[in-house]
Amino acid sequence: MENRWQVMIVWQVDRMRIRTWKSLVKHHMYVSKKASRWFYRHHYDSPHPKISSEVHIPLGEAMLVVKTYWGLHTGERDWHLGQGVSIEWRKRRYSTQVDPGLADQLIHMYYFDCFSEAAIRKAILGHIVSHRCEYQAGHSKVGSLQYLALTALVAPKKIKPPLPSVRKLTEDRWNKPQKTKGHKGSHTMNGH
């Protein structure tokens, strides 16, 4: 019988980001209770030796599973030390991988109070609406002018510690272009 391979997307992440993610998840599960329905699985509860943790986030009938890995092959850069994250959406027997932005939107939709564009319609109909968003990471686009005007009236409340964002966890902070202070360019390239 031949080998069958299964390919999955694993976002390379440094271990400090993973530690921060885990501590934020645990804080909001056990202290603030904003994520009390989430389930945290430790590495010693997992049958797979490369999984360092799993966070199971119920989304109605579906579930979002964020797995962190260790002991992976290192990347092309020195700081890619074999740590990674995969994000999976499951419903019954179907599962698919999702990107961090979509994961944050799903978490936002199910768990955190938000003053969204739908709130304008609800307010006109006389329904009680939340006047601020607790989970800013769940918004991927700029809102309408009405939405921006209404949010300008109410300053966003900073939550300490912040809510765990999957997008922030997988953000590539090393490959952003670096800016050097006080240099207009290379002297050899400028001809000076």
Swiss-Prot record:
Residues 151-164 are annotated as: Multimerization. Keywords: AIDS, Host cell membrane, Host cytoplasm, Host membrane, Host-virus interaction, Membrane, Metal-binding, Phosphoprotein, RNA-binding, Ubl conjugation, Ubl conjugation pathway, Virion, Zinc. It is a peripheral membrane protein. Residues 151-180 are annotated as: SOCS box-like. Residues 54-72 are annotated as: Interaction with host APOBEC3F and APOBEC3G. Pfam families: Vif. The modification Phosphothreonine is found at residues 96, 188. One of its GO terms (biological process) is viral life cycle. Residues 14-17, 74-79 are annotated as: Interaction with host APOBEC3F. The record marks 150-151 as: Cleavage in virion (by viral protease). The BC-like-box motif mediates the interaction with elongin BC complex. HAMAP family: HIV_VIF. Vif-defective viruses show catastrophic failure in reverse transcription due to APOBEC-induced mutations that initiate a DNA base repair pathway and compromise the structural integrity of the ssDNA. In the absence of Vif, the virion is morphologically abnormal. HIV-1 lineages are divided in three main groups, M (for Major), O (for Outlier), and N (for New, or Non-M, Non-O). The vast majority of strains found worldwide belong to the group M. Group O seems to be endemic to and largely confined to Cameroon and neighboring countries in West Central Africa, where these viruses represent a small minority of HIV-1 strains. The group N is represented by a limited number of isolates from Cameroonian persons. The group M is further subdivided in 9 clades or subtypes (A to D, F to H, J and K). This is Virion infectivity factor. The lineage of its organism: Viruses, Riboviria, Pararnavirae, Artverviricota, Revtraviricetes.
